[in-house]
Swiss-Prot record:
<dbReference type="InterPro" id="IPR016195">
    <property type="entry name" value="Pol/histidinol_Pase-like"/>
</dbReference>
<dbReference type="Pfam" id="PF02811">
    <property type="entry name" value="PHP"/>
</dbReference>
<dbReference type="InterPro" id="IPR004805">
    <property type="entry name" value="DnaE2/DnaE/PolC"/>
</dbReference>
<dbReference type="InterPro" id="IPR041931">
    <property type="entry name" value="DNA_pol3_alpha_thumb_dom"/>
</dbReference>
<dbReference type="Pfam" id="PF17657">
    <property type="entry name" value="DNA_pol3_finger"/>
</dbReference>
<dbReference type="InterPro" id="IPR048472">
    <property type="entry name" value="DNA_pol_IIIA_C"/>
</dbReference>
<protein>
    <recommendedName>
        <fullName>DNA polymerase III subunit alpha</fullName>
        <ecNumber>2.7.7.7</ecNumber>
    </recommendedName>
</protein>
<comment type="similarity">
    <text>Belongs to the DNA polymerase type-C family. DnaE subfamily.</text>
</comment>
<dbReference type="InterPro" id="IPR003141">
    <property type="entry name" value="Pol/His_phosphatase_N"/>
</dbReference>
<dbReference type="GO" id="GO:0008408">
    <property type="term" value="F:3'-5' exonuclease activity"/>
</dbReference>
<dbReference type="InterPro" id="IPR040982">
    <property type="entry name" value="DNA_pol3_finger"/>
</dbReference>
<dbReference type="GO" id="GO:0003887">
    <property type="term" value="F:DNA-directed DNA polymerase activity"/>
</dbReference>
<dbReference type="InterPro" id="IPR004013">
    <property type="entry name" value="PHP_dom"/>
</dbReference>
<dbReference type="GO" id="GO:0006260">
    <property type="term" value="P:DNA replication"/>
</dbReference>
<dbReference type="InterPro" id="IPR049821">
    <property type="entry name" value="PolIIIA_DnaE1_PHP"/>
</dbReference>
<dbReference type="InterPro" id="IPR004365">
    <property type="entry name" value="NA-bd_OB_tRNA"/>
</dbReference>
<dbReference type="Pfam" id="PF20914">
    <property type="entry name" value="DNA_pol_IIIA_C"/>
</dbReference>
Length: 1159
């Protein structure tokens, strides 16, 4: 290493620039260290997103971090044209000023790129050093235009306001006009006494990364690499050059090199990291600590009265609660976190006071009795052995972290309340970054390289869709990917390039729940990033960096299930009030309701929170949970680790007495562990049990036991060796055999890897139980709420509708006279379809209809509705959707009459409005159509056929409500099939099932091997089944998989691991016509003597003649007063039994007179 540094990189970008760099912070810092540089500047484009990690990494590597940003600027001199500047923080004042400039750039809104006004630099100039932006700066652009007056004017600004803090930036990277600019800049520097500084505008680390960088930029800009129109703004020379390279490059301008060192010496920013700063919570005359104690004791008293209404029992229980409360309060106050608990208490209490449901807890916070006393959580931690130290460990100082679930509808109101309470400038949400994930980066790189879609799609589909999937993992799990990589040079080139870009930051977004509350302005800690309209501010620092920078994060999460519970209770309590019954309080329901557990044991858990998947239902069937502890266990057991380890089987066998319960193992157990492991039948299932075992067996404090639990999770050999020794010595002190303690230690270590946080499991089990209880006791109201939550997802609505039918609930079509935007329940206990779930009907039209109904009462008919509603808010197509969905059924005799008269009703309403405007309405100001007028308008319109009605419902609702296309065939289909879909079960080997139903979905897919695969979904109104057709079956029957046709399918039924349901591999498939040809013996027609007239015979003959010549004979059953006779029509009248002819015969003779006869 040379004794004296000769150059410092002052201008580098990382991938946080999100437009023009592929460098991560850590590799950048490593490159700086490898080149033996003593300092480096980070100047990402208009953001400080990488500052905290950059600052920390540089200091820990023994180098000086220089913090800055590249910005776009506008000034009157340059008109609408942007120019570039680099802002460097000379000191903490400069850092704060750049923070404010970046925040203002986002907060005022922007079209393409955020920018600052040059005038802002005057107000925020203290402590800021400016590099001129080279050829793209205002001075550089004027130099290249050679306009002397404008050059002088541009320079004058910086000479006045940044006298010795402005440098002319030079770079030699092979970009256009650089050398011409440098020669002009040298003359200007001499003439105006301006210092020069050398930069290399670093965008990547090595020259070989240039192509990857260009692809990154093309992905952002939407070009392909070979597009002649693609802007080429960068060169292969913008890499991290060594000091030696830079010194050679600027050997002719030594002052430009020296000034990099001078600037580095001038810049010194100190960030306060690792400290926490909370806003002051108002506590009156009391200290924060004393106020927390007071509130906690008051809250605990309320809780104890609720938990133990009997005063004698309460006195017995009180000591252990008081003791636990005092322990927790001491720890919270000693660690300096009383304000945190009070802040969370306040916004949760505000939410409850304002009818915004809050979850009972989430994560380890449910283990705190103080949180329970303050009503932050709603689960008694002592009852369920939940540990405070799992949440806040006095032996490992870290911030407490309450994740709070709110009703989806109210979450934003809570954040708004917090902003009003602490000041809008002190509250912000947190940024999160989207990265180029494995599957997407293959697609993006393939597109930019110009590969055909099919080629890229094939490679992308070889990457499993699992969350967190990487290219490296994909190669491990998908052999075909490795084969394609090895055998195809184009595939190899694509993947190699994708590897360079995988994980690179793609975009910025808003963290799902993170909110920070600052004691002062947020911008005292971090800049603010906003959307294009300058709204929805988020910090430039992500959730980890923002906490490291001193701001405390609060997680405001939206949980849809809480919204469902609220909606259900709203419907329920309207009914309870109407019936004079007490309102339902979901927080007060018993946790041992027998009916709820019976429903649970039957696995009827569709729509029950966390318990509705096929895999979970199978686990429930095996476990047969009969107490709340079992539901807690279910949540913890249904994870890959326990399921794959055999732990689940042991748990179930022990519960049902098929395996001996031991604590924890038949060979190695100890009586002291029984109280800890009894709720889980001796299985170590929870992290809290690991901690309690260490405490009871080996004398650990619970704080120390939490550290042991963490160590076991990390599996570091050196740390585990130390812990084994501590565990053994502690056990021996407790009189427990050392060898036995080590055997138990090994078991604990094994299961610690699978252990789940019981606090989280218990809190979420409570939400699961609440939905289970609602489904059990208020099924219609609960299902109406669940369906409301899925109004935008037709597939989900279809599944939930099927569940309603299974439950014996009736779902009626939407009804404009009683319906609401949401699904609701009428006084007969029927679910009324939500008007908001009708396709093509937005909130505006619904609001207009409901407003008219609220103002004038229910609508008498279509003309009345059109007269009273604001037609400017509802177009014709919306009216048609409402009619075809059934929402207007009570406004006329049938849907066809309503459709036919819609135009007249709209015209009459329009004319009425014009007359009203001219003062020509009748004295009551309403339409003058009489009842007779309306009846006449509706007359002589034949109703729609059942098919037309059902097609309309499917089009507007996504499902069939009034009937089902398959309903008319159910009796017939029973002759072709072995079972209904709802009763279907997997076949034994060699066994075949035959089913029938309506094809509701059908497509052809490709397998990973490139083979065609037919996939269809069959619906017989009792359930649904996925069909798959391979090879010969697909070739032979594939064309029959037409959507909305009825088919009969035979094949092997098995479990589908992907969907969790059943699937059939089809062996044979018939259309309905083919099934009739095979199974139907004859067509029976019943006639009476009154029907047989010359005109009837003529009509009957006209119907049969076009379809005669088939194979199905016709038997006519003639009924007269003297008796019933069978007349077999001649073979020439045998027909093809199509739907069309059967429908026409039914229309002519009546449904009971036409019947298919089977053997």
């Amino acid at each position: 290493m040379s004794s004296q540094p000769r150059f410092i990189h002052l201008r580098t970008h990382t991938d946080f620039s999100m437009i023009d760099s592929i460098v991560k912070v850590k590799p950048l810092v490593k490159a700086c260290a490898a080149n033996e540089m003593v300092a480096m500047g980070l100047t990402d484009f208009t953001n400080f997103c990488g500052v905290v990690s950059f600052y920390s990494e540089m200091l820990s590597s023994g180098m000086k971090p220089i913090i800055g940003a590249d910005v776009k600027v506008k000034s009157p001199l340059c008109g609408d044209e942007y120019f570039d500047l680099t802002l460097l923080a000379k000191n903490n004042e400069g850092y704060r000023n750049i923070t404010l400039l970046l925040s203002k750039a986002y907060q005022r809104g922007y079209n393409d790129l955020p920018y600052i006004d040059q005038d802002w630099l005057i107000e925020h100039r203290d402590g800021v050093i400016i590099l001129s932006g080279g050829t793209q700066g205002d001075v550089g652009k004027k130099l290249l235009k050679e306009n002397v007056a404008e050059i002088e004017s541009a320079v004058a600004f910086y000479q006045e306001f940044f006298a010795d803090h402005f440098y002319l930036a030079l770079s030699r990277t092979g970009r256009p006009n650089e050398e011409r600019y440098i020669q002009a800049a040298l003359k200007l520097a001499e003439r105006c006494d301006l210092p020069l500084v050398a930069t290399n505008d670093v965008m990547f680390l090595n020259t070989e990364d240039f192509e990857a960088h260009e692809i990154r930029v093309a992905i952002h800009d939407g070009y392909t690499l070979d597009d002649p129109k693609r802007p080429k703004c960068y060169t292969s020379q913008q890499y991290f050059r060594s000091e030696e390279d830079m010194c050679k490059l600027f050997a002719d301008i030594p002052s430009a090199l020296e000034n990099t060192l001078l600037i580095a010496q001038r810049c010194s920013v100190t960030l306060r990291l690792g400290q926490y700063f909370l806003p002051q919570f108002p506590t009156g005359d009391l200290s924060t600590e004393d106020f927390l104690v007071q509130k906690s004791k008051e809250g605990l008293e309320e809780r104890l009265v609720f938990l133990f209404p009997d005063e004698k029992v309460r006195l017995e229980k009180r000591p252990k609660y008081d003791e636990r409360l005092q322990v927790e309060l001491d720890v919270i106050n000693q660690m300096g976190f009383p304000g945190y608990f009070l802040i969370v208490m306040e916004f949760i209490q505000w939410s409850k006071d304002n009818d915004i449901p809050v979850g009972p807890g989430r994560g380890s916070g449910a283990g705190s009795l103080v949180a329970y006393a303050l009503k932050i959580t709603d689960l008694d931690p002592l009852e369920f052995d939940l540990l405070f130290e799992r949440f806040l460990n006095p032996e490992r100082v870290s911030m407490p972290d309450f994740d709070v679930d709110f009703c989806m509808d109210g979450r934003d109101r809570v954040i708004e309340h917090v902003a009003e309470t602490y000041g809008r400038g002190a509250v912000s949400q947190i940024i999160t970054f989207g990265t180029m994930a494995a599957k997407a980066v293959i697609r993006d790189v393939g597109r930019v390289l110009g590969h055909p879609y099919g080629f890229v799609d094939r490679i992308s589909k070889l990457i499993p869709p699992d969350p967190g999937m990487t290219l490296a993992k994909a190669f491990e799990t998908e052999p075909q990917l490795q084969t394609a990589y090895d055998s195809d040079e184009e595939v190899r080139a694509l993947i190699n390039m994708a590897r360079k870009l995988e994980g690179v930051t793609r975009n910025a977004g808003k963290h799902a729940g993170g909110v920070v509350i600052s004691p002062t302005l947020i911008t005292d800690f971090a800049p603010l990033y906003c959307d294009n309209e300058g709204l929805h501010p988020v910090t430039h620092f992500d959730k980890n960096d923002v906490e490291y920078a001193g701001l405390v994060k609060f997680d405001f999460l939206g949980l849809r299930t809480l919204t469902i519970i609220k909606w259900a209770l709203d419907i329920i309590n309207v009914r309870m009030v109407r019936e004079g019954k007490p309102r339902v309080d979901i927080a007060a329901i018993p946790l041992d309701d027998p009916e709820s557990f019976e429903l649970l044991k039957r696995s009827e858990t569709t729509a029950v929170f966390q318990l509705e998947s096929r895999g979970m239902k199978d686990l429930i069937k095996r476990l047969q949970p009969d107490c709340f502890e079992d539901i807690i266990a279910l949540v913890a057991l249904f994870r890959p680790g326990p399921l794959q380890s055999g732990m689940v089987d042991n748990f179930i066998d022990r519960k049902h007495g098929r395996e001996e319960v031991s604590y924890p193992d038949a060979e190695y157990q100890h009586a002291s562990l029984k109280p800890i492991l009894e709720p889980t039948y001796g299985i170590i299932l929870y992290q809290e049990q690991v901690m309690q075992i260490a405490q009871v067996l080996a004398g650990y404090t619970l704080g120390g036991a939490d550290l042991l639990r963490r160590a076991m999770g990390k599996k570091k050999p050196e740390e585990m060796a130390k812990q084994r020794l501590v565990f053994k010595e502690g056990a021996e002190k407790n009189g427990i055999d050392g060898e036995l303690s080590m055997k138990i230690f090994d078991l604990v270590e094994k299961f610690a890897g699978y252990g789940f946080n019981k606090s989280h499991s218990a809190a979420y089990a409570l939400v699961s139980y609440q939905t289970l209880w609602l489904k059990t006791h208020f099924p219609a109201e609960f299902m109406a709420a669940v369906m409301t939550s899925e109004m935008d997802n037709t597939d989900k609505i279809v599944g939930l509708y099927d569940e309603c039918l299974r439950m014996g609930l009736k779902v009626t079509p939407p009804d404009i006279n009683i319906g609401k935007h949401h699904f609701s329940v009428n006084e007969q206990g029927e679910i009324v379809y939500g008007i908001g779930a009708i396709k093509g009907v937005g909130e505006g039209p619904i609001e207009a209809l409901v407003a008219a109904r609220n103002e004038g009462g229910i609508f008498k008919d279509l003309f009345d509705l059109c007269a009273r509603v604001d037609l400017k808010k509802i177009n014709r197509r919306t009216f048609e959707s409402l009619i075809m969905s059934g929402a207007f059924d009570k406004l006329g005799p049938h849907r066809a009459a309503l459709s036919k008269n819609l135009e007249d009703a709209l015209r009459a309403s329009d004319q009425h409005a014009k007359d009203e405007a001219m003062g020509q309405t009748d004295m009551f100001g309403v339409l003058t159509e009489t009842h007779e007028d309306v009846e006449n308008a509706y007359a002589n319109t034949p109703p729609y056929t059942e098919k037309q009605i059902l097609d309309g419902e499917r089009e507007t609702l996504g499902l069939y409500l009034s009937s089902h296309p398959v309903s008319r065939y159910l009796k017939e289909l029973s002759h072709y099939t072995s079972t209904r879909l709802k009763d279907l079960a997997p076949n034994r080997r060699g066994q075949i099932s035959t089913v029938a139903g309506l094809v509701v979905a059908s497509r052809i897919a490709m397998t990973k091997k490139g083979n065609r695969l037919g996939i269809a979904t069959l619906d017989d109104r009792s359930g649904r089944l996925d069909l798959t057709l391979f090879g010969e079956s697909l070739e032979q029957f594939g064309e029959k998989l037409q959507k909305d046709t009825v088919i009969v399918a035979s094949g092997q039924v098995s479990f589908d691991d992907f969907s969790g349901g059943l699937k059939m591999t089809v062996r044979e498939l018939m259309t309905l016509d083919e099934a009739r040809s095979r199974y139907v013996k004859s067509l029976a027609i019943s006639l009476s003597e009154h029907q047989i007239t010359p005109s009837f015979i003529k009509q009957f003959k006209a119907l049969l003649e076009p379809v005669s010549g088939g194979t199905l004979p016709i038997n006519v059953y003639y009924q007269s007063p003297k008796g019933r006779a069978l007349l077999r029509l001649g073979v020439q009248w045998s027909i093809i039994p199509t739907d069309e002819i059967l429908t026409e015969l039914v229309n002519l003779l009546g449904e009971s007179a036409v019947e298919l006869e089977f053997e």
